[in-house]
Amino acid sequence: NKIVDGDDVLTVMIYHGIGLKQSYYNDIDPRIDLRSVESESRMKELKSHGHKNLALTGFTKCDPLSSINQEKLNSFKLDQNLKTILYAPSFYPSSIEMLNQVFPELSYETNLIIKLHNFSWFQDKYKNQSKMMLELAEKNRNIFLVPRDDYNIIPYYYNADLLISDISSTIFEFLYLNRPIIMAECFNLRLKHKIFNKRFIKKMDLSRMESIDFVLRLEDPNNLISLVYHSLEYPKDLEQERLVAQREYLFKLDGKASYRMVNAIESKLIGSNN
């Protein structure tokens, strides 16, 4: 997308996700006047990459978690006697193809809400993912697929007792609620990334991925159900790690990241006018 230039224009960047891809550090235009940063650790990392005009705000996307509207959640008619799981995978690399076969059995005793990335709906090379999940939801009573025109994942976080994801930003966003997280590391890689694995590794923020200690990691899809039941029965497991991670990855959990961003914008504008 083209960024409008001009002395009377202030360009602000608020990143849509805070996941595990190197694009977080590289996907920035020199025209950006101010960039929202979600944590002190990321602030230091961006500065080490030479980025400037940074504002430490927290993650604005998570602000609504402090006041959730239940109306959207009730439309699914969830079984109130069952625990609710949210599955929110990335589009690539994704765990969808690997976990697809396990979900029907998982849904026997849980509500399973599936929230797909926008690319899984609208990009041709990923559309098979949404087709797969549509079929699952149609055939299984307790599996609910969030409609493609519902972009906002935040309300679904609130209703979930547990999150399952992979390399998605959701594993950091869900930290806000201090609830169990399962991180699937079983991916279906493209052929070129299977053959030339270094190309795939180059795209990932491996040091950040390896430092994650607040999740239960899943390598074998056949172990998913036992991990889910363990997490639901012992939700306090890894709680201390999650609380530490909240401070590490989300700065402040006060619902005021957007206010800090607005204040940073106003300060920038005042400075530009002086």
Spans of model-derived segments:
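Conserved catalytic-core segment of nucleotide-activated headgroup transferases in glycan assembly
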Residues: 61-134, 146, 218, 232-233, ...
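Short, well-ordered beta-strand core segments
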Residues: 11, 35, 163-164, 181
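Catalytic binding pocket for nucleotide-activated donors in carbohydrate/polymer assembly enzymes
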Residues: 48, 53, 169-249
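C-terminal alpha-helical cap of glycosyltransferases
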Residues: 254-274
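Structural alpha-helical scaffold elements that stabilize or flank donor/cofactor-binding regions
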Residues: 4, 28, 105, 155-156
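Conserved acidic residues
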Residues: 9, 33, 83, 158-161
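Donor nucleotide-activated moiety binding/catalytic core segment of transferases
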Residues: 126-172
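Active-site and donor-binding regions of nucleotide-sugar-utilizing enzymes
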Residues: 1-68
